[in-house]
Amino acid sequence: MADTITDAVSRAIDEAPTRNFRETVDLAVNLRDLDLNDPSNRVDESVVLPAGTGQETQIVVFASGETALRAEDVADQVLSGDELEELGDDDDAAKDLADEIDFFVAEAGMMQDIGRFLGTILGPRGKMPTPLQPDDDVVETVNRMQNTVQIRSRERRTFHTRVGAQDMDSEEIADNVDVIIRRLEATLEKGPLNIDSMYVKTTMGPAVEVPA
């Protein structure tokens, strides 16, 4: 299957018109035979891509003390408890942050306050923070999340996720696609039988089907 994925990725990149910006490569997945009105059937998975996403991933860490100091070297923003409370009083700023940031990480001790101040904003977006336990290394956690994508169907049968960038090697992108397909097959109730079709495409290019 790896060769067929690589062929599809290569075609998608080769057939894409030349643009004056760096395009991403996305995977579109069409599901079937699932009642997505039932939340238990929806896809909501974090997947670490072996070749990386090909783009910068925006990450915010909620932390204090030594953890906050270490996070400053790797995270895009580090927010304290006081700044969290300020966001809780400013819905517009909180919504802007939630829309701009890909992933949030928080010390476990701050999760209750995050739920209180930002739960209604982050929750529906599927962006509640990953809890950071006392023994967890914040640098390792953030570095891992730099190569992570969230695959989320919500109630839709068709959903998309980023699998790379146009200037990445086709085989690297294919490795990313393969990891996502394997995760989907392991997660879905009927495995591959719940996948109707899959396509890869650049941001502005044509869709190329990935053979089953």
Swiss-Prot record:
Gene from which this protein is expressed: rpl1
Family membership: Belongs to the universal ribosomal protein uL1 family.
This protein's GO CC annotations: large ribosomal subunit
Keywords from the named record: Repressor, Ribonucleoprotein, Ribosomal protein, RNA-binding, rRNA-binding, Translation regulation, tRNA-binding
Full protein name: Large ribosomal subunit protein uL1
GO BP terms, alphabetized: regulation of translation; translation
Subunit note: Part of the 50S ribosomal subunit.
Organism encoding this protein: Haloquadratum walsbyi (strain DSM 16790 / HBSQ001)
Xref: Gene3D superfamilies: 3.30.190.20, 3.40.50.790
Xref: InterPro entries: Ribosomal_uL1, Ribosomal_uL1-like, Ribosomal_uL1/biogenesis, Ribosomal_uL1_3-a/b-sand, Ribosomal_uL1_arc, Ribosomal_uL1_CS
Known function: Binds directly to 23S rRNA. Probably involved in E site tRNA release. Protein L1 is also a translational repressor protein, it controls the translation of its operon by binding to its mRNA.
Keyword Endoplasmic reticulum: no
GO molecular function: rRNA binding; structural constituent of ribosome; tRNA binding
